[in-house]
Structures are given as C-alpha cells and as structure tokens.
Amino acid sequence: MDKKVAVVTGAGSGIGRAIATELSYRDFHVIVTDLNEQAAKDVAATLPSARAVKCDVTLPTDSVAVANSVKEIEKRLDVWVSNAGVSKMAKFLDIDEKMYDFTLDVNLKGVFFASQAGARAMIELKTKDARIINIASMAAKAGRVPFLADYVASKFGVLGLTQAMAYELAPNDIRVNSVCPGFVSTPMQVRELAWEADLRGISPEDVKKMWIKDTPLGRLELPEDVAKVVGFLTSKDSEFITGEAIAVNGGAFMD
C-alpha cells in the first residue's frame, strides 16, 4: 500500500463521514467503520480508495478485528480517528444506570479500546509519525451543558485519556490529540434539537436560534469544519503537537 492508511470509526454519517472524505481528499486510503455496515459501505463507495468494515466500538474485540484486518490487508496504519459517539438528552435526575452505561460504553470505553487497538497496530507495524485523534466535544471543556450530564462525563474522560495516551505513546512516535466540536449540523443534532425543545417546552427552531446566538461566529458548525482540523492534525504541519484538545466551535466556548 503506497498511500497512507487511516481508520475512522463512526464514519457512516455526520462528522465521521466528513472526516473520511477529508482524509480521502488528502490522498489517504480510508477504512470506513460503523455499527451500520451498509452506511459504511455507502460512504466507502464515494471515496476513490477505501473499504468498509462493520465495527461496534462497545466491543473491544471489534476494534481489535479492524486493526488486525488493516495489518493483514493494507500492512500499514498511519492514522486512527476514534469518532464514534452517542448522546441522548435527559435531566440529571432522570438519567438511569442503563442510559449512563450506554453513553460511557460508546463515548469513553469505545474510544479507549478503539484507540488502544490502533496504537498496538501502529507499534507492531513500526509506523513512523503516527497519529491518533479522539473526537471529544465542547462539552468536555465546559460542564455547564444542560441535559447531558452523562455525555459531559464521557467527553471529559476523553480529554484525560488523550493526554495520558499522548504521554505514554510519544516514545513510539505516536502523536495523540483530541478535537472538540460545538453545535454541529448532523443527524444527531436533529435529535438533540427535538430533545432539548421538549425538555425546555419550546420549539426546535427556538433551540436552534439559541445555539446560533451562543456561537459568536453566527452559524451552526458543519461537519466539514471539524474534518478540516482533523486533516491538519494528520499533516506534517502538526508534527510537534500532541496531548492537545483543539476547540472547533465558532467561539461557543473559549479557553
């Protein structure tokens, strides 16, 4: 495989799809993974060099299987993007153990073991200048997000995990960073608009106006806004960046 190889989890739609497309534009061969196998195949079919693999990130064995297939088929792995994530809005006092466990299983455990599988493969393949990118959230930088306490906890965890990984994996020539999106126009956001509207007793359109008002640059974020930053983190220009959490949110939250 002459092209660089990237794995993107949760790439069947939304931010993950945009990341897969951006990396393809940057001449990567992309492994498009998703729990929805058909969605992964549909995305892979739009890219010049890609293949699709079904992957449930809540099952560490699935992530290991993806990494092993890359070692066997492509025989190189340059970039791993742990993007798969979920959210469901509820008041803190209404979040039960089942809801909490599901959110943490996907958003934190899923990132932990997916990125671990990628790192192991990179080390075994002796990859030089390897990159791992964990998709976090603006909610990882500001806990004052309503109706998402379990989600906030999971994304704060991703930031801590990213720093720990960056420190431990630096001797293996692996850089690890996270990206923190804000209010992104995705299928997930459509559901979030409806949930927040119901919880607040207002219309989804009013919630959308609130989100835009809270974003100084005056619009909702696009998946491509996130993907471009991920692309930068895979480039030579970012070779001395590791352990960082880069906010991409139009100013909705500022460090």
Regions found by a protein language model. Name each.
Residues A142, R219, G231, K236, ...:
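Short C-terminal tail/terminal secondary-structure segment
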Residues S115, S154, T162:
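Active-site helix of classical SDR
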Residues A170, R175, I241-G243:
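Short, small/polar-rich loop/turn modules that mediate ligand/substrate recognition or access, typified
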